[in-house]
């Protein structure tokens, strides 16, 4: 598999002395569904901002293949919605690419159709449910044809229908061969979809391996609920 992101011994220290990340190294491969777990304060969101080049590491470096620039779905989807309607919002994303109007409209329509929002393209974006807003955020990324998608705590503040909507999108993106990085402490929702599992704790990488092996860890020690306390195995975590 093609190596598309190389995270090489990165550390991030802030002016007040806080160490958010400490010597973290791993690679992301094309087609990965990488689940990164950790409790609040483990460094997940800081790591996301570094991979997406919204911030710079204090030391170490991150190498991203040019054709695999990241598209982000933030924990607060409202912060990504700039248009009054889903159509306006996705068109705003596409216009940044300076495409001909007809091509921009085709991309916007295709992205909204993939996320099941085309029929709602003219509704008020502000009145959408949490799950719909996450889908709209994904639509904007898809319209820009990003191959690497990063989800930061995608299930935060979602009701169960919203969770199912977001998981459904992830399953479809995985089937399309997209590379997904999901940062969450709610691992039971996507553990069965993941191809790799990373655990962060207090800014350090504690585990990088298969989800099956990850479930054998004392996850509670890292502030992560082990789904095997409620389910028998990964097969019980599959979404139908």
Task: Please provide the spans of the model-predicted regions.
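Helix-to-loop junction immediately C-terminal to a conserved catalytic motif
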Residues: 52
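H-loop/switch region of ABC-family ATPase nucleotide-binding domains
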Residues: 184-185
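Conserved ABC ATPase signature
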Residues: 124-128
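Conserved ABC ATPase "signature" region
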Residues: 102-120
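Catalytic Walker B motif of ABC-type/P-loop ATPase nucleotide-binding domains
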Residues: 149-152
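A short, surface-exposed alpha-helical micro-motif characterized by mixed small hydrophobic
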Residues: 190-192
């Amino acid at each position: 598999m093609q190596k598309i992101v190389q995270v090489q011994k990165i550390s991030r220290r802030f002016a007040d002395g806080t160490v958010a990340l400490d010597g973290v190294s791993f690679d992301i491969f094309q087609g990965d569904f990488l689940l990164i777990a950790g409790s609040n304060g483990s460094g997940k969101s800081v790591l996301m901002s570094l991979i997406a080049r919204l911030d710079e590491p204090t030391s170490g470096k991150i190498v991203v293949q040019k054709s695999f620039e990241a598209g982000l779905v933030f924990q607060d989807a409202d912060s990504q919605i700039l248009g009054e309607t889903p159509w306006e919002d996705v068109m705003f994303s596409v216009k940044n690419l300076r495409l001909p109007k007809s091509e921009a409209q085709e991309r916007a329509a295709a992205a909204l159709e993939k996320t099941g929002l085309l029929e709602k393209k003219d509704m008020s974006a502000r009145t959408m449910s949490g799950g719909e807003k996450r889908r709209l955020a994904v639509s904007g990324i898809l319209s820009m044809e990003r191959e690497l998608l990063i989800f930061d705590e995608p299930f935060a503040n979602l009701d169960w229908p919203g969770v199912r909507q977001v998981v459904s999108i992830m399953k479809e993106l995985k089937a399309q061969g997209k590379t997904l990085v999901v940062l969450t402490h709610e691992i039971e929702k996507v553990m069965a979809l993941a191809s790799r599992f990373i655990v962060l704790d207090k800014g350090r990488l504690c585990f990088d391996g298969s989800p099956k092996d990850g479930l054998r860890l004392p996850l509670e020690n890292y502030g992560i609920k082990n789904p095997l306390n409620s389910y028998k195995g990964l097969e019980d975590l599959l979404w139908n």
